[in-house]
């Protein structure tokens, strides 16, 4: 197991939820956190604890973003007119690594970030190697031709059930994904309940 895979499962255990819906997640077998104290009985969370957990879960889902990265995205969402929680989700889903993951070009969001960082994708014909690159509606993301035979890509794209959300249009014959529109919270296929409203409450008080 790679360090990144181990870290991913540690996030699941810390949250006590299978946040990516993976069949091999350890929380499918045990419902306590990582470490020697993980099996202690969980106390009911305070409002602060509930809000913090909501933030950590959303931050972890997108590849365990650092607090600095996540706080910057939140600050941008806060400046946009509208519901801050909805804006936050929309900005997160516009990340290039998130779109590569949603398009099922690779199996995990961690793999998507690495895939982008290694220069395997283009946006509107130009190579982009920054996972946090923010896509716009109408942008066309494509796996470079020389990268299409990589084992990680073949494994992901040959899955019988792809379940790509409708705000992304995928053409697997060309290995392209068109970002159609910015989604709202209800559009995003999270395997677990995400509560960006609690993230807003957390930052409002801290």
Swiss-Prot record:
Subunit structure: Part of the 30S ribosomal subunit. Contacts protein S5. The interaction surface between S4 and S5 is involved in control of translational fidelity.
Function: One of the primary rRNA binding proteins, it binds directly to 16S rRNA where it nucleates assembly of the body of the 30S subunit. With S5 and S12 plays an important role in translational accuracy.
GO molecular function terms noted in the UniProt entry: rRNA binding; structural constituent of ribosome
Keyword vocabulary terms for this entry: Ribonucleoprotein, Ribosomal protein, RNA-binding, rRNA-binding
Organism, scientific name: Cereibacter sphaeroides (strain ATCC 17025 / ATH 2.4.3)
Domain S4 RNA-binding: 94-157
Name listed for the protein in its UniProt record: Small ribosomal subunit protein uS4
Record HAMAP family: Ribosomal_uS4_B
Region annotation (Disordered) ranges: 15-46
Extent of the signal sequence: none
Pfam family, one: Ribosomal_S4
PANTHER family given in the database record: 30S 40S RIBOSOMAL PROTEIN, SMALL RIBOSOMAL SUBUNIT PROTEIN US4M
Protein family (similarity comment): Belongs to the universal ribosomal protein uS4 family.
GO cellular component, one term: small ribosomal subunit
Organism superkingdom: Bacteria
Gene Ontology terms describing biological process: ribosomal small subunit biogenesis; translation
């Amino acid at each position: 197991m790679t360090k990144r895979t181990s870290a991913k499962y540690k996030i699941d255990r810390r949250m006590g939820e299978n946040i990516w819906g993976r069949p091999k997640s350890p929380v499918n077998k045990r419902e306590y956190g990582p470490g020697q104290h993980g099996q202690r009985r969980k106390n009911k969370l305070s409002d602060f604890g509930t809000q913090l957990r909501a933030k950590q879960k959303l931050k972890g889902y997108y590849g365990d973003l650092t607090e600095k990265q996540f706080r910057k995205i939140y600050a941008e969402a806060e400046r946009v007119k509208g519901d801050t929680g909805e804006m936050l989700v929309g900005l997160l889903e516009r990340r290039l690594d998130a779109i590569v993951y949603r398009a099922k070009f690779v199996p995990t969001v961690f793999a998507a970030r690495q895939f982008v960082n290694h220069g395997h994708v283009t946006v509107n014909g130009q190579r982009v190697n920054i996972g946090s690159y923010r896509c716009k509606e109408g942008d066309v993301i494509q796996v470079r031709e020389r990268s299409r035979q990589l084992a990680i890509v073949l494994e992901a794209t040959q899955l019988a059930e792809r379940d790509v959300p409708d705000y992304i249009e995928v053409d697997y014959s060309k290995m392209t994904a068109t970002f159609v529109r910015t989604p709202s919270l209800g559009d995003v296929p999270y395997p677990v309940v995400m509560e960006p409203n609690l993230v807003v409450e957390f930052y409002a008080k801290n």
